[in-house]
Structure formats: structure tokens, C-alpha cells
Amino acid sequence: MIRRGCIIHGKNVGLHGDRTSTGAHCIAARSGMSVMGLLKLYIGDKTTPCPKCGEVGVIVDGDYRHSNSAAVAVDGSAILCRCPQGTHFLIAPGTIPQLSVAKAGITPSFAPEPEKHAQTGKKKKREITLTIGVFFDGTGNNAVNTQNMMKAYTAGHYNLDDPEAESILAKCARDNFGVSGSGATSYTGYYTNIHWLSTLYSRRFAEDNPNVQRAVYIDGIGTDARKPDSTLGQGFGISDTGVIAKTNKAVSMLADSIQAALDAVSNQQADNKLIVRVLQFDIFGFSRGAAAARHFANRIQSEDPAIISAIRQGVTGTDFNGSPAGKTRFIGIFDTVAAIGTPVNGLNPHSADTGDVNLLLRPGVAEKVFHITAANECRFNFALNSVKPAWPELALPGVHSDIGGGYLPVTKEHLFLTRPATETVPYSQPGEKTQAYRQAVAQLQTLDKSPCLAPLLRTNEISAETWHDDRLPPDRYGQMQKRSFAALTLRERTVRNDWPRVALRVMLEAAQEAGVMFDSILSKDKELTIPDELASLRDKALAMGKAVRNGQTPSTFSQDELDVIAEKYIHCSANWNAIVVNTDGLIHGGASPSEMIGFINRPDEQWQRTVYSMDGKKI
């Protein structure tokens, strides 16, 4: 074996003929720099057909710090094909095999064309409509990190349906990936509806159908694949993992995605000359990803030069008759929460001010828009950015991630529904006899009036709990004293993550009405199966969505139906959790964090969600 001897920032440089994680070989497309006679690989270079999915892959990332300003492919560089994102990547070992790659029949793509191909006759024209589906995941959601985490988790023979899975995942994230706390959010959650939509998005091309689709998945705000999550991005939606940065990432992936789609069609249509008659987008998003989807759609409508340039690069070598920046066919969004912290609004994500993020969806921005919102969400930091009355919007039961997804299959909730009240009392005084306890009990009247909480209160046991901190000195009379706390709690509650599958189907139907093509959900897809007790409620939700899209007033769920959903399937996202609970489930410590920073999931005023119109006014 011959040592490769070419390394950039600790990683081996990719060379012509290198294998990939799926067994394909990489093909250099640029003449110039070589190592031992093998040309270097760069972003945009392709692979032989992937043995797993059959599609030619495209190298989509590398090291941008190379001296000649080109992005050089290195060991681990991602490769885009039809395989799940994160599973196909370049393998650049430290040595070069003695066997020449030329013997394997892998020729650089810039090599002179054989004479017999140069003399091909006139080809028949074939017009296609190319649709790029762009899928913006939610804040703290990253399908690549989730997938890698699931592999590590299952390798440890853990059960994902274990209610304690969240704590086990946190340990796995720390032990296997070196991430913890807020840096591990995307490693300890689960797949969202954005992930499922991107995997179901049909990439099949039929000879009798001119429609071609290609999916581009964008990881969620505050996250990067295989990196710790960003506190700044998750908290305020800004910086290099913020909302606008994610739309920039989508633009940077356009050219390669377009070229890969055209290459796949060309491989099936070798005797035809392709003409792209229309290039259009389907754009999906959840949470801040929904804000990114809206901002990206506005960039398309305004004919952003960066998008025009990316499209031109992607269609190079193919006739293109569409609009320079393309157009948007469908925007499908789940519970838009922009929550942008800016210097102007004092870094307050509750503010209507979204800085440079453009949420306004003007007429003509897309052929169809559909927004599903969370009827039971009421957190202060999760104000809703509505699209009503300009576009159809349906509120379904559930909180934010009951609609967009991302909860683990089974979770156990230990929640403080009120901010703990506190007072210093004699050590012998029972907690139930304190003013703090009476204040906590009195707040139950406020909770009872909240439509967001009503189904949960009807179907779960709410308790008034007391605890104390006895690490206090005696009073001036020498009497022992304690710091007594009290709060309303919701404890030992097990919740399943099946309801988001209903919202997924409502969005699928809306998108399909707009012409979007998806593969069918198969009965073997257990992760997307709906429990029998939710089947009729799914049908009702589908009918409600159709009514809203037709401009009609939808029916509503009855109290009994809401209680069925709430008992086991609606999470309680709003809480005052900043309290330490020990391994025995006992509470200790107080409530010192500030409301803005420490209680990030605290409820909005009166447990009523703040809703902003597209022009930033409270509704």
C-alpha cells in the first residue's frame, strides 16, 4: 500500500476512485491537482451509481479553506443520493491501493468522449417539470443527529418505548458524542414530521410522467449534523444556525440537488434531450423551520440573485425555459414560531419583531399555502405567527411538537404547573398550613379557565405539593426554621407520540391536493402507524383540513373526543420546571431562575397563547 500523504486540517483528501460508505466509487471531474496520479475530488463531483439506491451520488460538502478557494472533498464528506441523509459519505483512507482504479473501469468524467458517442444522432426532446422539495426542520431537531443517536441507542440494546428513554439518551449522547445539556437537544429528541415528509417525498420518475421531484432536507435551527447544538441559535433563532442561515444553506444545496435530479433522469432517458420547462419548489417547515420556509419562499418570489445563480449552475448543460428563480407550488408549515431575538427587541423571542426574517406571505408567493397550528400550545416563548386570513390555517389539538413531531415515542412527565411559591416558616409548621400552599391552591382557578389546559385537567390528576429546604440557620430566638415551597404539579404522567401522525396525514393530503407526489405510507411503517382509537379522529381531522382549504368553517372535536386525545397523546409543554427532582422523585431546592432565562417553558399570561398576524399585530 502507498501512503496517501495529502491531508487538510486533519482529514485525508478524497481522490479519484475512492470508495463511499455504500460501496460506490467517486469520479473526479476537474483536471489539475493530483496525488500519485489520482485527481483530487471536489464538491460537485459524482459517484458511480449507489449500490443501495441505484442513483448517482453527488459530493455536497468539503473543506472550503483550501488554498485555491475550491471546496475539496475530504474523508467523511457527505454524498447526496436517494439514501437517507447522513448514511452516504466519502471514505478517504490513509493509503492508496496498489491496484489502479483505472483497472476498475472508473474514468474521470472530464476524459475525452469516445468517438462513437461523439457521433450520436439528433435526440428526441423531452420536457420535464422539476420540483425541488425543501424541508426545514424545527428548532433543536436534526434527523442526522437523531439517526446517529438511534444507532448508538439500539446498539446498547435499550428500548425506545421505555418511559425513561430520555435520561438514557442523555447519557448515550454524552458518552458517544460528547454532547450534553442544551448542546444535546437534537440528540435526545426524535424524528419530526418534516423528516417523515422528506423521506416520503416521491423521487420516482416514470417515462409517461413529466414530473420530477427532488428532496433537500435542512437541519433544524440551532443544530448542525454531528456537532453540539447552538444555544444562541436555539434560544434566539440567529447566528450561523439561525433562520436566515438555514435558508442560505438551502440555497447552497440547490445547484447540486438540481444537477443530481437531472443526472438521474438523463440516466433513464439517454436517448432524449432534456428540457426543463418549469422549475418549482415545494417548501415545508416546522417551528422556526416554518419561519425559514416562509422567508425562503419570499426569496424565491423576489428573485433573489443567489437563487438565480444556483439554478443556473444546476441546469448547466440542460435547456431551461422556466422563471430564473423558479416558482413555489406549495408551502406546508407546522405551527410557525419565529421567536427571533434581536438587539431591537432586547433579545426577547416573545416579541412580534422578527428582524430580517420575512414572514409575510403575499398573494402569488405560492400556488397553495396550508398551516397547521397547535391548539393547546401556550408557552410565553412560543408565540404563534399566523397566516390568517390570507391563507388556510387549521388548529388541531396538541402542543407545538404534538403537531410538528419530535417527542420520543413514550415520555414521562413530571411538571410544575405553577411557579413555586415560597416562605420561611418554623420548622415544625406543616407545609399544608403555609401561605405558600394556599397561594398555590388558589391558582387552580386560573388553570381551570384556560382552554389550552382544560382537556389535561379533565383527564389527569393535578396535585398541590409542598417541600422544604431545611438548610437555614435558626431565627433570632433560636427556633429552627425552613424554607417552605408549594406548587401545583402534574406527576408520573406517561404520554405517547402518536398524535403527530394525524397532523402528518392532514398535511400530506393538503400537499397532494396541490400536486405534490408522495410515496404511500405502508402498513409495515410502524413508526407512522396510527392507533385504532385515533382512527376516527384522524378521519375527522382530515375532513376539518379539507373544509378549511375550501373556505368553509370546519367541524370541531367534541369534549369526549378531546379527552380521548388529551389523556394519552397530548403533552403538557408549558410548565415552571427549573426545579431539581432526585432519583426518588422527591423535590428539593428552590425557584431562583429569572422568568426570561430560567423558565424557558413558562406559560404565557393566563395560559393563553399570544398570536401575531402576518403584519406583526396581536390577534
Regions found by a protein language model. Name each.
Residues 112-619:
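Active-site- or binding-pocket-proximal scaffold segments within functional domains
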Residues 1-115:
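Intrinsically disordered, low-complexity proline/glycine-rich segments
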